[in-house]
Amino acid sequence: MKLQRHLLLVVLIIFSSAFLFAQKQTITGKVTDSQTGQPLSGVSVRIKSSKNSGTVTNSEGRFTLSAEPRDVLEISYVGFKTESVTLNGETTIAVSLVVASAELNEVVFVGSRGVARAKIETPVPVDIIKVNQIGLPTAKMDLTSVLNYAAPSFNYNKQSGADGADHVDLGTLRGLGPDQTLVLINGKRRHQTAFVALFGTRGRGNSGVDLNAFPEAAVDRIEILRDGASAQYGSDAMAGVINILLKKDINHWTINTGWSGYYDTRNNARKFNGGNQYYSGNAIDGGSYTLSVNNGFAIGKNGGFINISADFLRQAKTYRQADTTNPQLNKNSLAYINTGRRAFGDGSVTTGGIMYNMEIPFSANGKTSFYSFGGYNYKASDAFAYSRNYSAKPERFPTNTDGTLINVPGILRVSNDGETYYNPHIQTHIMDISAALGIKGSMGNDWGWDLSNTIGRNDFHYYGDKTFNASNLGKSAPNHFDDGGFNFLQNTLNLDVSKYFKHVAQGLNLGLGAEYRYERYAIYQGEDASFKSLTNQQIIYPNLVGDGNYDSLRSPAAGSQGFPGFSNTDAVTANRTNVGVYADGALDVTKEWLLDGAVRFENYSDFGSVFTGKLATRYKLLSNFNIRGSISTGFRAPSLAQIHFSNTLTSFSGGALVQSLIAPNTSGIARAAGIPDLKQETSVNGSLGFSWKPVKNFTFTADGYIVKVKNRIVLSGLFSKDDPTLPPSFTSQFPSDVATAQFFANAVTTTNVGLDIVADYTMKWDQNTLKVLLAGNIQHISIDDIHIPSALNDSKLHQKTFYSDREEAFLKASAPKGKWSLGLDYTRGKLGFGAHLTYYGKIVLLGFGDGASPSGDNPNYSGINPQVPTDADPSVYVPEVFNYNAKVTTDIYASVKLSKNLSIFAGADNVFNVHPNLGVNPLAKGWAGDNESGGPWDSVQMGFNGRRLFGKLAFNF
């Protein structure tokens, strides 16, 4: 009897256990990245024995589903190894996914507020760049230069002789303007620089984001979406989006330090500085030193962290000239002295910054988290302006009241042929500060939400150094001026919500949101001496008397030479607000067919409303072959700088220095010219392409695109107040000390057509790894229409003055017709070697031309087919066309991992010392330097500094 009771108890326990294990129970869990400990959103969690039972993790990496106690969960996520977890009756689990090395860098977040997707499965092309991997094996020391080298659709050239453009680094996508690409940090809108480009070969009349205004060490990776995305993100995203993702690492020190310098054995000015004609430096110049530090620390016990980065960069000047001593060695060499730019090259830079990225869950369940990121950066730079030569322009020198020169040692120089000259310095102090903070979480039926505020401010302050206010008669000082500057503030408030509906078709992610943005722009004046004339007296300059010069009686130049300061009439403070709402969705119609769509409405307080939309799709023809395409409308709001910028500055035009007014769009002179209020630029963007992964380690993508932009904002040409054919109602608005004026206007319609190709192959065997990356961009830019203001549209001369052939050439040269890069990287154990080749397509630019040209349709400054006299016969004129033919540069490096904590890199960029062709018509070499930079070359292609050596150390512990 006792035995029977025991057997009955055992049977009851067995049946009870079976009953319990047969009951479904609620399972909760969290999925994190094994490397960073951070939660992963959009991870697929499904019951292995059931095809239809599953879910995805929310924005905090958490999931909930019903399962039987002995079920096996399969947890998968693109870019990570799939994990299987047997429940064994557990109701709470934690899973850490390990990165799948073969698919590292494949996960894409930008372009959709839905779950992440593999790079080759996105409906639009996206480049993913691991900054630390590409930044170490190169001499390039800043983020903008690294992107120019890594992404063929991204283009950037360091400017020289372009006033403020020498001091800020703005890049472009697909040949559009630098302000037609939106920049995000951690998915939040980044503020633009306060600067607007007035000179230079790229981005004339545009603003943009300075990608060097935060530490490169803070960046984990960069996603470049090469497609219009205004419907998803708002203004500026016509060419695409650059999303910068910050590091989240903790307990891991990364310290990188390096040196680089230019070793140009061909065009360093010290090689032929005969007679003190040029400023020059050392055999290796442009020396750069950089130091960066990164580490992170855990906060609390719920997975919180803060990651902190800091960097420092110091770069010296470079000095370049074309060879004037040995024409036999170079058929394009020049037999002349460049008196316009006796100091030509890159300016010097000292910059440093700090940035943080943090996230703190409120509780152990991690459903709600606080996050914040931001930083501070300061840059001091110094660049040479155009040369001042006493024989031609004595009124720009310090003189006594009788016109005799006052010698100022340390500033004035005398060449061996008796010319007295000096080079003013333009200095800038640029401060950039930003902070973002927000709260994100989930609620209800897995609705994710994110409430954030992002603020950023940029201040751009000019100084003139080693220069003069020549109207300060009888005095040689001051020689340093506060020229004033401008600043820009942007504050953005966002609310975003999203939800994944797993039972709609094969899955639908819906995103909704609203944005409120406040912007403020201000110009602040410099000290009086930086812009004012300190005398009403005219001077007879003795060196001009008796030389046949009819105008020896001149007024001394007012203001700081090189960059006249902002005056009290320039000073302005302006602001605006805008409100936007959007909806976007990503629908997996079938397992093969993905459909994306977005709509957005925005209203600006200054110009009104705009509505944009986008439709994108991807179809999986085979498991490894996808076709994709999109069509969208976009817009870019005119920047406050374009609307309100005002300055009187020194411009180099037609071989002469003139005082030019850039009039604000709100001014009476702009209205007299018939220029209306600036409005938004609009675009239509289409793309079609495919992605293919024929084998595990090889991917190939090709994407064609067309972007049509209407009402592009450009900076007009220079109109002279002495032109008798202009309406008096217009010329009467000119200030008395100004010779010419120009304006911002919605004036140009363009079409960009192109093709992007990327082929990526990685092969591993034993201890060897070979990586081959071929990437290219082919494109054509056409100008379809130019809208001339009514008061300036009465003649071909005025039409071409408004937007000249020369300006058209600059716009078309926003990117080369082709740019290709081939990277070969090989590692064996602790050793690494690599070679990177870059092809730059042909660029064609125009000079200013000779105002004395006999051509009836080519008077001075007309901009119509600029021509210059030939060296052989001054009565014969030829077009001043600069053909910068296609070039190929080669970068090489070697690396050694000395220990688990230390690696060393060394090599040379542009190892064969390739330069652009000289900026001159070979038949008119005497006119060399009549280009935008005033030097032997424009700022195009690979730049003019030549070979660059480098060495770097990378510490990890």
Segments the model singles out, each with a brief description of its role:
Residues 30-50, 72-80, 88-136, 186:
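Short, acidic, small-residue-rich periplasmic hinge/interaction motif at the N-terminus
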Residues 64-65, 188-226:
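Short acidic/polar hinge/loop motifs at secondary-structure boundaries
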Residues 64-66, 144-193:
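Extracytoplasmic beta-strand/coil segments of soluble accessory domains associated
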Residues 91-97, 143-146, 150, 169-171, ...:
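N-terminal periplasmic accessory domains that precede
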Residues 193, 709, 780, 839-863, ...:
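C-terminal beta-signal and adjacent terminal beta-strands/loops
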Residues 251-254, 275-414, 418-420, 427-438, ...:
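Transmembrane beta-barrel wall of Gram-negative outer-membrane proteins
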Residues 416, 422-437, 442-444, 455, ...:
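Outer-membrane beta-barrel transmembrane domain signature of Gram-negative proteins
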Residues 512, 704-849:
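Gram-negative outer-membrane beta-barrel transporters
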